[in-house]
Amino acid sequence: GYKFDQPNVKYASLDIGSDLTADINQWGADYYKLPQNSSDYYVFFEADPRVPLLPVLPKKGQKFWYSDRGDLVDSTLTRQIDLSKVKKATLQVDLWYDIETGYDYGYVMVSRDAGKTWTTLRGKHSTTSNPSGNNLGNGYTGKSGGWITDTFDLTPYAGRKILLRFEYVTDDGYNSAGMAVDGVRIPEIGFYDDMESPNSWQANGWVLSGPYVPGRYSLIILDANSPERYVLVDAGADGRAIYKLSAQDPKDEPFLIVAAKSDNTLQKSIYRIQILPKEPGYLTLLAGRASR
C-alpha cells in the first residue's frame, strides 16, 4: 500500500467571549480549537450570504455574460450580426479575463459562411503567441487586470450577414476564472448591447449572470457529547448558524471546522465567529439555525 504523511493542520484557539472575523477561500476550510468548559456555551456563526462570482463588478448595469470555468471547456456565445447595409464596420467589446497563461485561451470570432468556418479577430490585447500549441489564432490569455475595451475591424465582412462568437477553450490541467463580456457595440449599424438580457445570443456553456452567487457554508463541530462525536451544521440562506455545546469532559477536545463551498467561484468571503456563555437573545437576532 501507499504511505502518506499525516497533514499538519494549523488551527487557532477560541475562548469563551471570543469574537473573531476572518476570510476564507471557497472550497477551503479553517480550523479552531473550542474551549473545554464545564458548562454549556454557544457557537454563533455569520458569513456573507452572497459571494462575488468574479473579482470585478459588471462594467455597466447588473449582469454580464460569463464563460464559466473548468477543465476541457469549450464554451461559445454566438449571434447573427447584419452588416449587409454598410461598407465598413467596427466592433467594440468590453472584456474581462483571467485565463491560464499560455495554455487556455479566449477568442472573439466571426463566420461568413453560417458557422462552417471561423476566423479569430485580432485585437490590441490578443496574442498569436502559441507556446503550448493550444492557441487557435488570435487569443486572449493571462489576466486583463480589470475590464478592458478592445476594437476590431469588421470591414472585411461588411455587405453581408455574419455570425459573431465569443469562445473560451481550456485544456485538462489547471484552470483560472475564465472570461466575461459586458458590452458589444457596432456603431455603424447602431448596434449596442449592454448584456442585460439574452438578446438573441445563443449560449453553449456561457451564462448570463449577476456579480454574486449564494454563499454556502458548513460547520463541523467535533463534539464528544453527540452520538457520532461530530455534528454537521449547514448555515442558512442568510449565512448564519448556531450550535450549543453542552458541558465537556475535561479529557475531550472540541473543535470547529468552517468550510466555504459557494458554487462557480473561488473568491473569498468573510465570516464571524462568537463564543458566548449563554443565549442572550441572539437566536432571534441572528435568525440562524440552532442545533441542540
What do the predicted segments below correspond to?
Residues 83-85, 95-99, 156:
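Non-cytosolic beta-sheet module surface loops
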Residues 98-100, 113, 169-171:
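Short coil/turn motifs at secondary-structure junctions
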Residues 89-97, 162-169, 195, 258:
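Extracellular beta-strand-rich recognition modules
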